Amino acid sequence: MSTKESKPNLSHSQVTDVVKRLYGLTASVVRPLPSYDDQNFYVAPSEGGEFVLKVMNSADSENVAVIELQTQSMNFLHQRGLPAQTALPTLTGQLMSLEEFDCGFGTQIYLVRLLTYLPGTTIAKITCSPQILYDVGKMAATLDTVLLQMEHPNTRVLQRERFIWKLTSIPLLNQYVHVMDGDPVQKIVKGVIEKYQVQVMPKLPLFRECINHGDFNDHNLLVKPDGPSKYKISGILDFADMSCGYFIFELAITIMYMMIESPTPLDVGGPVVAGWESVFPLNEAERDSLYWLVMCRFCQSLVLARYTVIQQPENEEYLMITSRKGLRHLSRLWELGKDEVERRWFQSAQQFRQI
């Protein structure tokens, strides 16, 4: 995980300088955008167009091969009709550049990219109808199936076996769970970790493999109006958590994040599953693991947000967006139990398919 010392902290003047030097563009408008570990800026050059300058934290900037593959994946998806960002080449034809900056902790190297800006509203800001939830599930499954078609000599770098946000890394949460000391929810978190090890890990060989986006959340999905009361997905953002994984991981992550802002979170799973299965039907082992994998993602979000706030207390408001509400959802799902939650999800999915 990145730390406070690795997060970039570029000034307005540094942004305008790097945009001019690397891309030959004069930034007439620059404004910061929210980010968990990195630094993002909206940039509107006087020459025209709209972009996002993405400055990776210095820890992740060491993984050049991973970020290069993420960038190529975005281009691949865009070429196949999915609403992903693309990277603008530098004046020397590179899709990324390693730059030195002193952000208060000595000179460090940060990886910089200029990505196309996708207009739209994050799904977190709208009330999601069952139809848009269905579309989200369908889009998540489509993304994973399209990425299976991508050929690249370095796909092995996406194994990322100890990447803390991978769902296979749930046992690694034991290193961080101490940040929950004194919180009664810690007992639930420990219980979920144990259930993952006992009930999910033995089924991993039965899951279908793919490349996961890994962060299909309500702040990384953009929508735009499609008629008087409808929306359609207009953008998929932030591929920084891409890794080799399993189809069922993407679905679990998607359901968890779509629950966060929902006034009726238990009603989210059904439409998302229905949309997902319209592209990629689940097998028995995947269906049987979905509840625990959703719970695992809630635990990751809660524990890692608490840990990161200790590193970045000034960023607490943004870091805790998901985990504050996720705390209630995690407790409620635990209280209801696997059988009842799965019954609601799969029954609702079946009913949605019959509409």
Swiss-Prot record:
Q: Where does the source fall among the domains of life?
A: Eukaryota
Q: Give the matching InterPro entries.
A: Aminoglycoside_PTrfase, Kinase-like_dom_sf, Pseudomonas-type_ThrB
For this UniProt entry, what's an example GO CC term?
A: cytoplasm
From which residue to which does the signal peptide run? Answer: none
EC number(s) for this protein? 2.7.1.81
Q: Which Pfam families match?
A: APH (PF01636)
Describe the family membership recorded for this protein in Swiss-Prot or TrEMBL: Belongs to the aminoglycoside phosphotransferase family.
The molecular function GO annotations come to: amino acid kinase activity; hydroxylysine kinase activity
* Protein name according to UniProt: Hydroxylysine kinase
Keywords noted in UniProt: Cytoplasm, Kinase, Transferase
Query: Which reaction equation describes what this protein catalyses?
Result: (5R)-5-hydroxy-L-lysine + GTP = (5R)-5-phosphooxy-L-lysine + GDP + H(+)
Role according to the record: Catalyzes the GTP-dependent phosphorylation of 5-hydroxy-L-lysine.
Q: Which residues form the active site?
A: D215
Q: Where in the cell is it found?
A: Cytoplasm
